[in-house]
Regions:
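Two-component histidine phosphotransfer core
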Residues: 1-159
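Hydrophobic core positions in the C-terminal catalytic ATP-binding module
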Residues: 102, 170-178
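A short beta-strand-to-loop micro-motif at the C-terminal edge of the catalytic HATPase_c
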Residues: 157-171
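Two-component histidine kinase transmitter core
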Residues: 179-184
Length: 186
């Protein structure tokens, strides 16, 4: 309400409202161990909108959920999409010349879903993350969360993999497999 009374341009008002929305959702989601796929993807969309101006006009982001998947009913670890998306933008796409592409794709597998985050940025260089204003904290938290959850689930486990794209492509691909039957109780 107070933002609408702000005497800035419409773009500034919009960005400020998106920032407030992002911060509010960030606080909500980081307090939870699991969230619906829909909530996580909505959060990621807000983050992408905030970063769009900084990354540049030649930034294209797509989020696709395969037909037949009910994103409101599928539970996933909180931040499991947001952290790879943030890393792709910060470390792969920001400052890159030319077209910048970020794709999030959610597909069905036999007993779960696969979430793939792909960019056409610089590629994944673990030793460079800390040198490019990153601390690696997001990935460390993600790995520890997955490890903890996997120890509590005796059958199917979450699988998380980061690779550099091949076949002459540049960029990084993060692939996450999440079983449908998975407990988030610790």
């Amino acid at each position: 309400r107070e933002i609408n009374q702000f005497n800035g341009s419409e773009e500034v008002k919009h960005n400020l409202m998106e920032l407030v929305k992002y911060l509010r959702r960030s606080l909500e989601l980081t307090e939870k161990l699991s969230v619906s796929l829909q909530d996580e993807l909505d959060f990621v969309r807000t983050y992408i909108e905030l970063e769009r101006g900084r990354v540049g006009e030649d930034f294209v982001a797509t989020i696709t959920v395969e037909d037949g998947l009910d994103a409101t009913r599928i539970m996933i670890p909180s931040m499991i999409v947001q952290i790879p998306v943030e890393n792709a933008i910060k470390h792969g796409l920001a400052g890159k010349d030319g077209k910048k592409e970020l794709m999030v794709y959610v597909s069905r597998e036999t007993n779960g879903i696969r979430i793939t985050v792909t960019d056409n940025g610089r590629g994944y260089l673990p030793q460079v993350v800390s040198a490019t204003r990153g601390t690696g904290t997001g990935l460390k938290v993600l790995y520890k969360t997955i490890q903890l959850l996997n120890t509590k689930n005796k059958s199917d486990k979450i699988r998380f993999n980061i690779t550099n794209r091949s076949d002459g492509q540049t960029g990084t691909e993060v692939s996450v497999y999440i079983p449908f039957r998975f407990s988030y109780d610790l």
